[in-house]
């Protein structure tokens, strides 16, 4: 069992990583006997895990209600958020309730925002079931829903009480979802840890076959990196922005193509190549390093070009609505070397458009 602490003073919390955690009531601390829980999951995961998690919580004396949401990025919306509020109010659940997010990034982000908003804030626990959510979205307290004009535009910073990562969940993950998660894994190597990127080049095949020790190390390292960044910059005023490598381009793809048509990790993968091409055009990143990124993403089964039906010009309106925009100016996360990156302002739209075009004609 691995345990990492996200250090935020009184709001610090543990990330527990192991197999078989759904069999242990102690995994779900700080829940105690007699407490009330609303378990939030989706229609795909409910048949796999709902009864198991409900059973282990009830074994610990916890009172459990549940709400099952439709599955898909297109349902990360205000309308679906309202169904969670309705379920909480119908019982009713008070300010002493705990929300448990059992699912991937959509369930985790939406449940976290529900917890941040319901009666001005109730406790919640993240139980991520996808690789993407285990290595990234469940850690750090970013909660949100989408708007038709932009991804994650309505949300809050709100930290969980704990994160429970059961490695056994990956056994039921479709290959496309596994690849999507690997995009965020590869991102950490590009922006922060060149040695980890080297390790990924050597061990990607083991991750694709869900080798236990390799996957446990991979998730632990990603969570360590994320925890360090969040502890240093919880509200994304500086360092934490680096975690958005590929996301400015990727969110544009998701919004333009319709949420759910491109998985988040797929869009981020293409976006990371666009960021690398942008950095190349600025003369601060080598084509050889871009090729290393492309090769690793391709081996993971991820796209390295944008959608053919999306023109370079179609990216700009979405990118100019990005949350990192300041005074109307785009701020891009760009690699400087494998393992090192920067937040860059003042890049001309023409250069960005040419970099995007590089990734359409490649």
Swiss-Prot record:
Q: Which InterPro entries is this protein grouped with?
A: Dehydroquinate_synthase (IPR050071), DHQ_synth_AroB (IPR016037), DHQ_synth_fam (IPR030963), DHQS/DOIS_N (IPR030960), DHQS_C (IPR056179)
| Cell location | Cytoplasm
Q: Tell me the keywords, alphabetical order.
A: Amino-acid biosynthesis, Aromatic amino acid biosynthesis, Cobalt, Cytoplasm, Lyase, Metal-binding, NAD, Nucleotide-binding, Zinc
Binding of NAD(+), residues: 71-76, 105-109, 129-130, 142, 151, 169-172
What's a BP term from Gene Ontology annotated to this protein?
chorismate biosynthetic process
Kindly report the protein's main subcellular placement as a broad class.
Answer: cytoplasm
- Reported EC number(s) for this entry are 4.2.3.4
Name a Pfam family for this protein.
DHQ_synthase
What Gene Ontology terms describe what this protein does at the molecular function level?
3-dehydroquinate synthase activity; metal ion binding; nucleotide binding
Instruction: Report the catalytic activity.
Output: 7-phospho-2-dehydro-3-deoxy-D-arabino-heptonate = 3-dehydroquinate + phosphate
So, what pathway does this thing act in? Metabolic intermediate biosynthesis; chorismate biosynthesis; chorismate from D-erythrose 4-phosphate and phosphoenolpyruvate: step 2/7
Q: Which family does it belong to?
A: Belongs to the sugar phosphate cyclases superfamily. Dehydroquinate synthase family.
Q: What is this protein called?
A: 3-dehydroquinate synthase
UniProt lineage: Bacteria, Pseudomonadati, Pseudomonadota, Gammaproteobacteria, Enterobacterales
């Amino acid at each position: 069992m691995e345990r990492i602490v996200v250090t935020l003073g009184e709001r610090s919390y543990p990330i527990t990583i192991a197999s078989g955690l759904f069999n242990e009531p102690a995994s779900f601390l700080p829940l105690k006997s007699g407490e009330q829980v609303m378990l939030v999951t989706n229609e795909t995961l409910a048949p796999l895990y709902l009864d198991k998690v409900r059973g282990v919580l009830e074994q610990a004396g916890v009172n459990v209600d549940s709400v099952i949401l439709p599955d898909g990025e297109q349902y990360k919306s205000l309308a679906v958020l309202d169904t969670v509020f309705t379920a909480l109010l119908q019982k009713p659940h008070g300010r002493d309730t705990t929300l448990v997010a059992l699912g991937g990034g959509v369930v985790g982000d939406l449940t976290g925002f529900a917890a941040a908003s319901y009666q001005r804030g109730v406790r919640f626990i993240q139980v991520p079931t996808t690789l993407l959510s285990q290595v990234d979205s469940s850690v750090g307290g970013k909660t949100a829903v989408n708007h038709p004009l932009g991804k994650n535009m309505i949300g809050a910073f709100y930290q969980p009480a704990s994160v429970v990562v059961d490695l056994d969940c990956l056994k039921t993950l479709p290959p496309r979802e596994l690849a999507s998660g690997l995009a965020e894994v590869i991102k950490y190597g590009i922006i922060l840890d060149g040695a980890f990127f080297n390790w990924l080049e050597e061990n990607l095949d083991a991750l694709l076959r869900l080798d236990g020790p390799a996957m446990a190390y991979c998730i632990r390292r990603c969570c360590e990196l994320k925890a360090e960044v969040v502890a240093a910059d919880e509200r994304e005023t500086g360092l934490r922005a680096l975690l958005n490598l590929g996301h400015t381009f990727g969110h544009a793809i998701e919004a333009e193509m319709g949420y759910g048509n491109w998985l988040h990790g797929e869009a981020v993968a293409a976006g990371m190549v666009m960021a690398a091409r942008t950095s190349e055009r600025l003369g601060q990143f080598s084509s050889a390093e871009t090729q290393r990124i492309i090769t690793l993403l391709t081996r993971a089964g991820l796209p390295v070009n944008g959608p053919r039906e999306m023109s370079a010009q179609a990216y700009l309106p979405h990118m100019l609505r990005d949350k990192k925009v300041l005074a109307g100016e785009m701020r891009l996360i760009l690699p400087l070397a494998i393992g090192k990156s920067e937040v860059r302002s003042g890049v001309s739209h023409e250069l960005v458009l040419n970099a995007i075009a590089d990734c359409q004609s490649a």
